[in-house]
């Protein structure tokens, strides 16, 4: 940069860059004591003293006298705009000092704001990636099994919290992915800003750093942290997810509705049955059976227990033709008690009159113990089963169920002491006439019948009759 030229003066200012060096040369350069920058052209206001720069060996061998001055532009830059200063020497070399243009400086306060913003974006990106793993790693069947069978109340509550989010699974998924993409793009832009501000690299360098940060914070850390405590973290961050859904709803909600139309909505209704195929119990059973342990039997019981939810009363009932039933007019005689005892009957269904469709109640064999003598022998009496039902009113506690009713709907009645459930089936009739029964008794269901569906055959009074 030649500031001293005999008989010449250029009115345009020199535009200074960070690494520019001012060179002075000429016959009288050796008389220059120092150089400085002034805010006015008269060189009366010294704002920055220049430091003489040591010459390279090549420049020392040049003919003539040469002096170099180096300017630290960063010390003179201002974020308010371009600054103009005048180069001056002592003593002056020309009547009019030469103007230098200092480019606009960078606002460091913005950097102090951008750094916390970068940390926030990294944290949010990791959170969104982790939530995607935590919430979507549990299937609807997994959550329902935890709600219904887990003994830990806290785990049940956490499963309920996550199930609340899964009712809008597409909306939640789009929200999480949108938030993750937004944070990742922001991280890349911020890294590019820092690279330009500090001047530490080009496009490839910025991409490498951004890729490394995203790999660590959005892939590795979420996989290590969120997968170990997925249900607990997803439950605790449910309100954060809901808040994010509200903020991003103008974009994420229409996309979620579009996914519902194209792919369908996930069935997260609490009343929906478990999808047994999704549980893959058969695969687990086959894998563990090769180990020769008891896992096969345990998984078989689990599978039968779950399938019991799908069965109807007609699937587990004992058909009425195989049930020992007695008329209300049957006298309680010695032979009757002996016959009932030998056949292994513990519960005696009593019907009204001559029709087996009108069940009056169910007597327990223990009720007959009142008529036994001290030696266990029955005595002939004039009592009938109908009379005993009238006396023992509590033994009339039984329930009627339709043959199409699911087993789980009347299991609680059997557990609470109901001796048996009478299964009825409605007849197909054109019109209902007076005194015409529109239903028929087709079987009975006891608690033992339900247990047999789970554990297999149990030796009970039905098997005693077959023996």
Curated annotation (Swiss-Prot):
It is a multi-pass membrane protein. Glycans are attached at residues 61, 364. Disruption phenotype: No visible phenotype. Quintuple knockout with cnnm-1, cnnm-2, cnnm-3 and cnnm-5 results in a reduced lifespan and 100% sterility. One of its GO terms (biological process) is positive regulation of gonad development. Keywords: CBS domain, Cell membrane, Glycoprotein, Ion transport, Membrane, Repeat, Transmembrane, Transmembrane helix, Transport. GO terms for cellular component: plasma membrane. The keyword Transmembrane helix applies. InterPro entries: ACDP, CBS_dom_sf, CNNM, Ion_transp-like_CBS. Residues 132-170, 218-238 are cytoplasmic. It comes from the Eukaryota. Its main location: membrane. The chain crosses the membrane at residues 111-131, 171-191, 197-217, 239-259. Residues 1-110, 192-196, 260-467 are extracellular. Pfam families: CNNM. Residues 317-381, 394-461 form the CBS domain. PROSITE patterns: CBS (PS51371), CNNM (PS51846). GO terms for molecular function: transmembrane transporter activity. It is found in: Cell membrane. Residues 107-293 form the CNNM transmembrane domain. Probable metal transporter. Probably acts redundantly with the other metal transport proteins cnnm-1, cnnm-2, cnnm-3 and cnnm-5 to regulate Mg(2+) homeostasis. Belongs to the ACDP family. This is Metal transporter cnnm-4.
